[in-house]
């Protein structure tokens, strides 16, 4: 990873230095930049491919200048250091925009977290790495006139990217599409986007309530966080609207269970849910330097003619043995058979068995498939899913 640009000698050089810092963070493939004040200096850390790592350390005296410049760029209160603040900046000099900034007071000073934005158009559904059957199922769900499409996974799993790809795939000319988000992460032409503002009482439920009076065809709710939002989203899906939303849950079946715990009756879920999709992001092994995983790889090559299970090595091109990330997906299309099984009280393992019988692999199945092909490592599957792939 490249070194930081030299510290500026004069205060008037600070803006150019900060722009260069942001540009280098982006070039390093970082999704987040952390500025962490400590007793002996300020540590800059980057999150790359979902994993945090130390970048550089700068003198403690420079922390206030760096924080001040970023706060000015994000139009935050420069004098307020006691309370957390949230903002957004765009920096033409660094070549990146739509950077989310969050500050946090700590015992050593203000910590900053910068979520580096992704400029350009919304992602294409065909570039998400979905299998042909999964892509077809998602496309069919998006063509429905009403119902609920639920994307689930933990923070950092790529749910928002998938939502934006879904919205971009819709016909914006013949449908009125509106969103409620926290925050708006990407501007989509032809779509009415609203950001929640909790400080003035503008939360998901209140915006959704207002949007339903705006004659929408498609609604995107950034996240279901409470009973009221869950109830309103399901009611909207029942009354002639296609609703796309996300939920924090570990799997497709867990997402349905979570909605049940939020007060949505089973029969209502069976009637309104069109598709649930769980997803994760795994680090893709660098094809230049990946190393076969002992004798197991030879057996896999002989049996499948694939590259076989591999582990990360690291080279000058990739730095840490990884080259980007790859998505794994678990789909639960709510057809009549699965809806009946859900209403009959079939437990999670039973529902997952039904999914496999219908040809819908689980997250662990997809991870194992990529591992056997040498695209991801066993260690990364353990990091993301909590268990290693079965041999």
Predicted segment positions?
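Short, flexible helix-loop junctions that flank or precede catalytic/ligand sites
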Residues: 2-391
